[in-house]
Amino acid sequence: MKMQLMDLKKQGIDIQENIPLSRFTFTKTGGPAQYLAFPKNLDELKILVETVKTNNLPLTVIGNASNLIIRDGGISGLVLILTKMDKIVANQEEATVTADAGARIIDTSEAACEASLSGLEFAAGIPGSVGGAVFMNAGAYGGETEFVIKSVRVLTREGKFKTYTHDEMEFGYRHSLVQETGDIVISATFGLEPGDKWAIKAKMEYFNGLRRAKQPLEYPSCGSVFKRPTGHFVGPMIIKAGLQGKRIGGAEDSKKHAGFIVNVGGATATDYLDLIHLIQKTIKKDFDVDLQTEVRIIGKEKD
């Protein structure tokens, strides 16, 4: 298997071995990828998917790794990072923006603004990729990815291209169909509304101002860790439980925004997960509320 993957490297595909994924995650934590590839186009992506399928090798796809915790043992098999696939095309006449999965959702919202198209303002400060935003149904400030998705193009694990309509994506709170199917998002088309460019820009700047004021952007983090339980707010519960500012190793529940766990220096994924579990256990005991993680947690424990 190693020989086959390295042969792909000779063909010009960027593929590496035993690379620490902490280099790519927003938390600056995570163990190594057994193999790591950065496909530049659909042809390379298809070759990689077919190679791992033929050899029965595990396949993991990540985007900008902004809402992701990778355990300290890393990930076996092949990890694909799609950030080199980042084309964005705005069509003012059709009021759409189509973006590759590896494009940043921030850049996609800015492209919409430049084309005087409204609907993606909420995404102006979300640090993830388009693929990640679709996968997680990312949202902020009353906006959700599902509100503006027109269609999603994917590559199935069998190596077939397929397009889903909005309704076929089965969006829910931080959920989409591709979480169940394992399909790889390769692009998304957003259906937007014509608007005033300067009003759109002002709204984006307003949301970014709120983000800077309320979120601990000065530290590495994976953003909001927990889903909001029905009838409750996570931050106030954490504060009432006395856990704001709680630190395990280098992971700390942010003093600026309870519910954000930041890397204040030298944190490991285990530190993050231990703090998450402590918060979940305490909130269950104090409030009888089961906190579910919003952040995606993957990989294996360190031996």
Curated annotation (Swiss-Prot):
Pfam families in UniProt: FAD_binding_4, MurB_C
FAD-binding PCMH-type domain: residues covered: 28-195
GO molecular function, one term: UDP-N-acetylmuramate dehydrogenase activity
Keyword Chloroplast: no
HAMAP family: MurB
Function summary: Cell wall formation.
Protein name stated in the entry: UDP-N-acetylenolpyruvoylglucosamine reductase
Originating species: Lactobacillus gasseri (strain ATCC 33323 / DSM 20243 / BCRC 14619 / CIP 102991 / JCM 1131 / KCTC 3163 / NCIMB 11718 / NCTC 13722 / AM63)
Gene name linked to the record: murB
